[in-house]
Regions:
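A flexible loop/linker signature enriched in serine peptidases of the S9 family
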Residues: 46-52, 65-71, 84-96, 104-116, ...
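Sec/Tat signal peptide C-region and signal peptidase I cleavage site
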Residues: 21-23
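Bacterial N-terminal signal peptides
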Residues: 7-19
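Beta-strand-rich domains and repeat architectures in extracellular enzymes and scaffolds
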Residues: 25-56, 73
Length: 152
């Protein structure tokens, strides 16, 4: 009987090292979530190099991009209807926007230097991004804007 009790306790102690699943979500998987952006009704974040949104309480996660490229730097417009983000689809990082409900991303910049989203202008008509496109030494980022209707 004593031997059976010891084996049972050892078995239970081994299970204490197994990752716990809470509400169907493996808590270890959340380590891949990064770069959160918050609006009045949603959270946008990068998970496994794709852009996702969820409700403020974390429910209803929705994958917005499924491209082979790498998305980064999500940012909500002031009215919460658009998400601007940087993406590397053609070997270069450019600025894109997408409706918060999802859809096809719209490319706003076409430049050989990386364009990294930093936010929206106060009027919401342009996206603010950082780039080395005008820098002689490629050591310093400068800020630029591009209209949400497209640009350079």
């Amino acid at each position: 009987m004593k031997r059976l009790l010891i084996i049972g306790l050892l078995t239970l102690s081994l299970y204490s090292f197994v990752p716990v699943t809470i509400c169907g979500i493996n808590t270890n998987d959340t380590r891949m979530m990064s770069q959160p952006a918050i609006s009045a009704g949603h959270i946008a974040f990068i998970y496994a190099e794709d852009l996702w949104t969820a409700d403020l309480d974390g429910s209803n996660p929705k994958r917005l991009t499924v491209d082979e490229g790498i998305e980064s730097n999500p940012c909500f417009s002031h009215d919460g209807r658009l998400i601007a983000f940087s993406a590397q689809y053609d070997g270069n990082t450019d600025v894109y926007i997408i409706p918060v409900e999802g859809g096809v991303p719209v490319r706003l910049t076409w430049h050989p230097n990386s364009d990294l989203v930093r936010g929206f202008t106060p009027d919401g008509k342009s996206v603010l991004f950082a780039s080395q496109r005008s820098s002689f030494t490629n050591r310093y980022l400068q800020l630029f804007t591009v209209g949400i209707g497209g640009g350079f």
